[in-house]
């Protein structure tokens, strides 16, 4: 990571985030996806952040939980996320781990395009963010999400309606709160 403003305890967390985003591998080497991000960030940052968000949903248990459990138009704050997640993760993570993870996620929403631009955590009031539908999903991000979903589920064929089933985990609808209209429009 070279020269940076991260504290000693932040560096391992940031490396973990880069691995979850599939930007670096387990040996901290830039991946092919990471190089794609470097090559395209200047020209299409919104696409790159959408692809990063998709990867993090699949690779981070807490972010995956967020995508699958916080609904469109649902307001939240860190304390509420931690409380809800603790009920789900109490046997796997300590309360402090969950609190710190959601504190970091709130920072991602506040200081990266994942919040306002991708609509995952838009300012709602002084203390709350809200999750909205991300209506400007690119064809590339849509295709990538479908690929990740098919790969994760061993699927060879996908139907739009399957993404709206109650038991559907991850996928474009959960990742970006897509309405059926937006999803179908993106497929045309």
Label each PLM-derived region with a short phrase.
Residues 1-188:
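Donor-sugar nucleotide-binding helix/loop cap in glycosyltransferases
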């Amino acid at each position: 990571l070279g020269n940076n403003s991260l504290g000693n305890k932040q560096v391992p967390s940031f490396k973990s985030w880069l691995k979850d985003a599939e930007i670096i591998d387990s040996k901290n080497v830039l991946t092919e996806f990471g190089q794609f991000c470097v090559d395209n960030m200047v020209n299409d940052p919104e696409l790159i952040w959408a692809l990063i968000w998709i990867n993090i949903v699949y690779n981070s248990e807490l972010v995956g939980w967020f995508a699958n459990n916080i609904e469109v138009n649902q307001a939240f704050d860190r304390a509420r996320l931690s409380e809800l997640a603790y009920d789900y993760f109490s046997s796997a993570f300590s309360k402090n781990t969950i609190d710190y993870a959601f504190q970091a996620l709130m920072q991602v929403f506040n200081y990266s395009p994942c919040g306002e631009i991708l609509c995952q955590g838009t300012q709602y009031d002084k203390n709350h963010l809200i999750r909205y539908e991300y209506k400007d999903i690119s064809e590339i991000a849509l295709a990538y999400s479908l690929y990740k979903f098919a790969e994760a589920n061993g699927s060879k064929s996908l139907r739009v309606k399957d993404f709206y089933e109650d038991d559907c985990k991850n996928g474009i609808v959960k990742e970006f709160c897509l309405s059926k209209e937006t999803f179908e429009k993106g497929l045309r």
